[in-house]
Amino acid sequence: MARIAGIDIPREKRVEIALTYIYGIGLTRSKLILSNTGVNPDIRVKDLSDSDVQKLRVAAEDFTVEGDLRRQEGMALKRLQDIGCVRGRRHRMSLPVRGQRTRTNARTRRGSRKTVAGRKK
């Protein structure tokens, strides 16, 4: 199994798809890496030569991927929360950040319903 950026990429998949298993590399960036390195995107990972795997490793190091990217995103959210802006407060309260309505929707973000007993008439 080829190991790139600390991730074992699946052997049976095409290289173009297998690279997307790395956090921070999508299909577009995968195609860019393959065109820069000159590796055929239709070949399977198990058929890659060691030199091809090494080329892909070096190319993937040019991008912020995996742990570094996760840390960067976490720090960006923490910064928003620390400065107390609206987006940071919404993140802290687990509410939608981008202006969506919350009266009837946003169940995913708010969690399951908390039933409130009705008042007797």
Curated annotation (Swiss-Prot):
Record's GO cellular component terms: cytosol; small ribosomal subunit
Coiled-coil annotated residue ranges, if any: none
Q: Name one Pfam family in it.
A: Ribosomal_S13
> Keyword Membrane on this protein?
no
Extract one GO BP annotation from the record.
translation
Enumerate the residue ranges of region (Disordered): 91-121
Tree of life domain: Bacteria
Subunit structure and binding partners: Part of the 30S ribosomal subunit. Forms a loose heterodimer with protein S19. Forms two bridges to the 50S subunit in the 70S ribosome.
Q: What does this protein do?
A: Located at the top of the head of the 30S subunit, it contacts several helices of the 16S rRNA. In the 70S ribosome it contacts the 23S rRNA (bridge B1a) and protein L5 of the 50S subunit (bridge B1b), connecting the 2 subunits; these bridges are implicated in subunit movement. Contacts the tRNAs in the A and P-sites.
| Protein name, entry field | Small ribosomal subunit protein uS13
In its UniProt entry, the species of origin is given as Prochlorococcus marinus (strain MIT 9515)
